[in-house]
């Protein structure tokens, strides 16, 4: 199984109700050998049109956050908990998230084998932490998931609604957080392709 083959399979997914309203499947994009993987919640309107993750206003802000920290977007792999746009941009429902992560995200993680995962927002953080969480309480802290470092951060869409840069504001905290991610990235040794612990619920073939 390759990432390209997995992406091709995802284009015809009918596993949950989200397929009914989608225009495009938004599988993910970036470096298939990335050390850093960023996982959002779900595609928005612009992403649904283009088939690419984080290309709308939140994505443009994410680009600026990465650039400010000296992390080239093309070196990162970016995807979402669900690959199809939820109606009215609502958060994915638990059953939708479970179906999509079991079918696609876990396999993406196995194939890419990132060393750091940054979940953006509560829905993504809850998947990796395994419980209902408040993003304000878990952001900016290191966790471990199947041997991979996990560092939750605010979703850029939340930052757009809270534009203040004052000390202690979400934007200020995000600036501190992304610098911590950059320090951790810089401290990693050159990545070697290695077998990782199986995390998917289904075979890879």
Curated annotation (Swiss-Prot):
<feature type="binding site">
    <location>
        <position position="155"/>
    </location>
    <ligand>
        <name>uracil</name>
    </ligand>
</feature>
<dbReference type="InterPro" id="IPR005122">
    <property type="entry name" value="Uracil-DNA_glycosylase-like"/>
</dbReference>
<keyword id="KW-0227">DNA damage</keyword>
<keyword id="KW-0004">4Fe-4S</keyword>
<feature type="binding site">
    <location>
        <position position="84"/>
    </location>
    <ligand>
        <name>[4Fe-4S] cluster</name>
    </ligand>
</feature>
<feature type="binding site">
    <location>
        <position position="13"/>
    </location>
    <ligand>
        <name>[4Fe-4S] cluster</name>
    </ligand>
</feature>
<dbReference type="GO" id="GO:0006281">
    <property type="term" value="P:DNA repair"/>
</dbReference>
<dbReference type="GO" id="GO:0046872">
    <property type="term" value="F:metal ion binding"/>
</dbReference>
<comment type="subunit">
    <text>Monomer.</text>
</comment>
<comment type="similarity">
    <text>Belongs to the uracil-DNA glycosylase (UDG) superfamily. Type 4 (UDGa) family.</text>
</comment>
<keyword id="KW-0378">Hydrolase</keyword>
<protein>
    <recommendedName>
        <fullName>Type-4 uracil-DNA glycosylase</fullName>
        <ecNumber>3.2.2.27</ecNumber>
    </recommendedName>
</protein>
<keyword id="KW-0479">Metal-binding</keyword>
<keyword id="KW-0411">Iron-sulfur</keyword>
<feature type="binding site">
    <location>
        <position position="80"/>
    </location>
    <ligand>
        <name>uracil</name>
    </ligand>
</feature>
<dbReference type="Pfam" id="PF03167">
    <property type="entry name" value="UDG"/>
</dbReference>
<keyword id="KW-0234">DNA repair</keyword>
<dbReference type="GO" id="GO:0004844">
    <property type="term" value="F:uracil DNA N-glycosylase activity"/>
</dbReference>
<keyword id="KW-0408">Iron</keyword>
<dbReference type="InterPro" id="IPR051536">
    <property type="entry name" value="UDG_Type-4/5"/>
</dbReference>
<feature type="binding site">
    <location>
        <begin position="40"/>
        <end position="42"/>
    </location>
    <ligand>
        <name>uracil</name>
    </ligand>
</feature>
<dbReference type="InterPro" id="IPR036895">
    <property type="entry name" value="Uracil-DNA_glycosylase-like_sf"/>
</dbReference>
<feature type="binding site">
    <location>
        <position position="100"/>
    </location>
    <ligand>
        <name>[4Fe-4S] cluster</name>
    </ligand>
</feature>
<comment type="function">
    <text>Removes uracil bases that are present in DNA as a result of either deamination of cytosine or misincorporation of dUMP instead of dTMP. Can remove uracil from double-stranded DNA containing either a U/G, U/A, U/C or U/T base pair as well as from single-stranded DNA. Specifically recognizes uracil that is flipped out from double-stranded DNA.</text>
</comment>
<feature type="binding site">
    <location>
        <position position="16"/>
    </location>
    <ligand>
        <name>[4Fe-4S] cluster</name>
    </ligand>
</feature>
<dbReference type="GO" id="GO:0051539">
    <property type="term" value="F:4 iron, 4 sulfur cluster binding"/>
</dbReference>
<dbReference type="InterPro" id="IPR005273">
    <property type="entry name" value="Ura-DNA_glyco_family4"/>
</dbReference>
<feature type="binding site">
    <location>
        <position position="54"/>
    </location>
    <ligand>
        <name>uracil</name>
    </ligand>
</feature>
């Amino acid at each position: 199984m390759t990432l390209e083959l997995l992406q091709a399979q995802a284009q015809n997914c009918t596993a949950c109700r989200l397929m009914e309203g989608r225009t495009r499947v938004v599988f993910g994009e970036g470096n298939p050998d990335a050390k850093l993987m960023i996982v959002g919640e779900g595609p928005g309107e612009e992403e649904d049109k283009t088939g690419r993750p984080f290309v709308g206003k939140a994505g443009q802000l994410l680009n600026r956050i990465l650039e400010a920290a000296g992390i080239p977007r093309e070196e990162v792999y970016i995807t979402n908990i669900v690959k199809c746009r939820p109606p009215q941009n609502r958060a994915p429902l638990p059953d939708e998230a479970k179906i999509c992560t079991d079918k696609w995200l876990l396999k993406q993680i196995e194939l890419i084998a990132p060393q750091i995962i940054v979940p953006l927002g509560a829905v993504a953080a809850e998947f990796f932490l395994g419980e209902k969480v408040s993003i304000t309480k878990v952001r900016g802290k290191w966790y471990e998931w199947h041997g991979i470092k996990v560092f939750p951060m605010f979703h850029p869409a939340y930052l757009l609604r809270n534009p203040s840069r004052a000390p202690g504001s979400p934007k200020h905290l995000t600036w501190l957080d992304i610098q911590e991610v950059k320090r951790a990235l810089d401290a990693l040794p050159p990545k070697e392709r290695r077998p990782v612990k199986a995390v998917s619920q289904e075979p890879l073939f």
